[in-house]
UniProtKB/Swiss-Prot annotation:
Functional note: Central component of the receptor complex responsible for the recognition and translocation of cytosolically synthesized mitochondrial preproteins. Together with TOM22 functions as the transit peptide receptor at the surface of the mitochondrion outer membrane and facilitates the movement of preproteins into the translocation pore.
An example Gene Ontology CC term for this record: mitochondrial outer membrane translocase complex
Entry keyword set: Membrane, Mitochondrion, Mitochondrion outer membrane, Protein transport, Transmembrane, Transmembrane helix, Transport
Source superkingdom: Eukaryota
Biased composition annotated in UniProt, kind: Low complexity: 58-67
Disulphides: none
Family the entry assigns: Belongs to the Tom20 family.
Organism of provenance: Caenorhabditis briggsae
Protein name (Swiss-Prot/TrEMBL): Mitochondrial import receptor subunit TOM20 homolog
Lineage of origin: Eukaryota, Metazoa, Ecdysozoa, Nematoda, Chromadorea
Single GO biological process annotation from the record: protein import into mitochondrial matrix
Stretches for region Disordered: 48-67, 155-188
Subunit structure: Forms part of the preprotein translocase complex of the outer mitochondrial membrane (TOM complex).
Gene name per UniProt: tomm-20
């Protein structure tokens, strides 16, 4: 047996391949560093994300908010969890893209599906803007009906009480929140 490969010494071929690989890796690192440190890098990334959101980058994977979503099997906790997380993610993405109404529908779906809806609403009250949170609260009454239609009779067996909301703002709470507070006081 010979120590040649295509007429070259095997050790020289291995050495040349190693040097070529290291040179290519250095080339990649250099240009990635140059790209990231460009002064307009972050602006380009933001513009690209806005363009994707505006041109339908999300629309291909987003179900319509009008209640035509594919309903998961309510007896499968993993499907329900996946649906809940999807609703939260879609709601946040839509609101970040400026579509507050459709985002509020998805977040309201998530709130109604959550076992700890009061805590989730409290979190959203702290993380969303006042306008966005108000839109979510306005969607809650119709969300119960929409989910009942989506899931059938099993949705009626779920939590029948509206979520409690703790208003942390100055002055009296908005009318929608006051209605929810008044509804829960009837249970005592």
């Amino acid at each position: 047996m010979t120590d040649t490969l295509f007429g070259f010494n095997k050790s020289n071929v291995v050495l040349a391949a190693g040097v070529a690989g290291a040179a290519f890796l250095g080339y990649c690192i250099y240009f990635d560093h140059k790209r990231i440190n460009a002064p307009d890098y972050k602006d380009k990334i933001r513009q690209k994300r806005r363009a994707q959101a505006g041109s339908g980058g999300m629309a291909a994977r987003r179900p319509p908010a009008g209640g035509n979503e594919m309903a998961p099997d309510v007896t499968d906790p993993s499907q329900m969890q996946r649906f809940f997380l999807q609703e939260v993610q879609l709601g946040e993405e839509l609101m970040a893209a400026g579509n507050v109404e459709e985002g509020a529908v998805h977040i309201a779906n998530a709130v109604m599906l959550c076992g700890e809806s009061q805590q989730l609403l409290s979190i959203f009250q702290q993380t969303l803007s006042e306008e966005q949170f108000r839109a979510v609260v306005q969607q809650l009454p119709s969300t119960r009906e929409r989910l009942a239609d989506m899931f059938g009779a099993r949705a009626d067996e779920a939590e029948n009480e509206p979520p409690l909301v703790q208003y942390l703002g100055d002055g009296p709470p908005p009318a929608q929140i006051q209605e929810l507070i008044d509804d829960t006081d009837d249970l005592e």
